[in-house]
Amino acid sequence: DLDGTLLTSNRVVSEFSKEIINKIMDKGIKFYIATGRVYANTKEIMESIGIEVPLITSNGSRVNDKDETLLYSNPIEKKFINDICEIDYKKHGEEIFLNAYIDDDWIVSGHLPEKAEIKLEEWNLDYPMIMPLNEIATKEISKFFYIGEHENLLKLERELLDVSNGELNVVFVSPDCLEVFNLKSNKANAIRFILEREGIEMSEAVAFGDGFNDYEMLQEVGKGYVMGNAFYRLSEALPDNEVIGTCDEDAEAKKLVELFL
């Protein structure tokens, strides 16, 4: 995982982590990235580490080989997109804003709040495309995500679960971010797909994560490590998994040293 795991709270990979990743790969250890981010942004992070690996993006909805070839894509089914776009999410909290990913394009409905614009500058992210909901409803969507206060998103979560009737993934990746994506898509399924191509068993893999979108991945690999800064639902759901340090303590890299160097 990237945000809250490999990346620091400043959304960068530390020099120590870069060094360790390259060292384990030099020893022949396979290393993969599995994130909720889109491909283009994930590729930039991969390049900052100085490696070329297959990328699992949009929470397992898309997998690209290291030569950029799209290996598979599982967008949200069209029948759900209209239902989601018809939800009056603002009734749960005026601060909530709706985002969507169309391929590698980040879309925001309405306008981007000032607080979010400040974060864009802090994290050096590109400005999203602004698009009305009725136009978003006509597109092929990799995932939706809502940003807002946690207590308000909890109310929205209940409505989304009712609307989807359990046929979509509705998960918190962090307290202030609620994501919606194809039920068949998760990081574990995407990892299994990549490992099968490499002739590797899931039981031979280790993984690191902090959000509930990491749940299946951490549960199904041989050893799943929960970050010390993990979202409370993830920690509660995986009480037997080892908890390591935080993303600002290079906890993943330190565990990789312990395991492989």
Pin down the residues of each PLM region.
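Asp-based phosphoryl-transfer active-site loop
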Residues: 1-11, 218
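Conserved SAM-binding loop
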Residues: 6, 31-34, 55, 180, ...
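Active-site phosphate-binding/coordination module
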Residues: 10-115, 229
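Mg2+-dependent phosphoryl-transfer enzymes with acidic/Ser/Thr/Gly-rich catalytic loops
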Residues: 14, 179-261
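Hydrophobic packing residues within well-ordered alpha-helices of enzyme cores
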Residues: 17, 42-46, 156, 160, ...
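Short active-site oxyanion
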Residues: 28-32, 51-53, 142-143, 203-204, ...
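Short, structured coil segments at secondary-structure junctions
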Residues: 49-51, 59, 163-166, 220-221, ...
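Conserved acidic, metal-coordinating active-site core of Asp-based
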Residues: 87, 92-208, 214-215, 229
